[in-house]
Amino acid sequence: DPFDVDGYAALLRRARTVRARAVYAPDFDREVHQPVAGSIPVLPEARLVITEGNYLLSPDPAWRAVRGLLDEVWYCELASDERVRRLVARHERFGKAADAARAWVASVDEPNAAAIAAWRDTADLVVDVASLGLPAGRD
């Protein structure tokens, strides 16, 4: 797994404890398919920090350590067909041909979604995204 879970945990620790200056978090640039360090400032006056990630409910020990740094973890549930539609559209928007986007979703994203769904019941709250009445998202 190329994700730096230990660095993520260190960032969350700093965001919780450092009050004298901003703490900077990375963003992910989908245009270049790379994280961009220091893109998101968490200001000292911030009292609520929202983070997102597929593995926040993972039973893996490194991810359990991350979960221990969070007050709550919510699972956002979306119907499978809508998730697939959004993922395919996102991959197409960032340069994949339609067939390649569908193949990627089927071989990578959907198996990942199945693993993540297995941890659903460990969430503090399950949010049914469709019930929120929001307009359909781009991704």
PLM region descriptions:
Residues V32-R90:
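ATP-dependent NMP and nucleoside kinases share a basic, alpha-helical "lid"
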Residues D1-H33:
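Conserved nucleotide-sensing/catalytic segment adjacent to the nucleotide-binding pocket
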Residues A22-V23, L48, A97-A101:
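Short, basic, glycine/proline-bearing loop/turn elements
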